[in-house]
Amino acid sequence: MPNRRQYITSFSNPKVKWVAGLKEKRNRDEEKKFFIEGYREIKKAITSNSNSPIPCLPVNITSLFISPECFLGENEEALINSVKCPIFELPRKIFEKISYRDRPDGLIAVAETPDAHVPWDKIKSIDTNPILIIEGVEKPGNLGTILRTAEGAGVGLVIVTDPRIDLFNPNVVRASTGTIFTLPVYIGDLKEVLTKFQSKGYKRYAVTPEGKTLYTSINMKEKSVFLFGSEQYGLSDDAKQLSDDTLHLPMLGEADSLNLAMSCGIVLYESIRQRNK
């Protein structure tokens, strides 16, 4: 079997400049590639399930950049051997140049950017609870945290509508701890999505500071879709009007709202509490 590992020793190597450039959205768009940094994140990417009733995003890794000097564990080589693609080995100083992290662990995978629009034709069934819709999210770290929380709370599907950010921004991947690859996450049209779920018997709840109903007052054992809006502007009028009810979280201080990711977490874990009663 030919040796797939190539050694890079110069900062000026074109491959170094190319992979470092994928930190920028314009380069990701042009190359139709994005990078996945970290052992945990890459591990989840290569084990993502695209054959479930609601498939996860497909991940096709095309190259791997490694620096054994930065490895933090004992399983890195096994992971490297499981990925069938060209491998580029770099010294620590060069790897740190391309890394997105303060303390890199020596692993960056480059993957093809998948089509992230909802694949309605590939969804075998929609019978999961709850479902989460995020409208107009602006901060990559917030979206990543929401995905991590949603996966932990047993959410069956996340749809991002009218996103202000790139779904494959390195901060989204990092803050999600790789759950962007193990949880079905897609981009969709708000009206189409809400109409689709209404036809499937879902209750649609818009969570907003001025919501009429306290979030703990509804029956979350029923098939539920929860809508959350952007950090700055909240939910659009369309989102509120197309929902069956509007929910609010109690605010006892001077602040008028909570962080978007925290609000999602509170509602989703109330859903767990009710479903487990």
What are these regions, as identified by a protein language model?
Residues 106-109, 149-153, 167, 171-178, ...:
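Structured adenosyl-cofactor binding patch, chiefly the S-adenosyl-L-methionine
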Residues 80-110:
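Glycine/small-residue-rich loop that forms an oxyanion/phosphate-binding "nest" at active or ligand-binding sites
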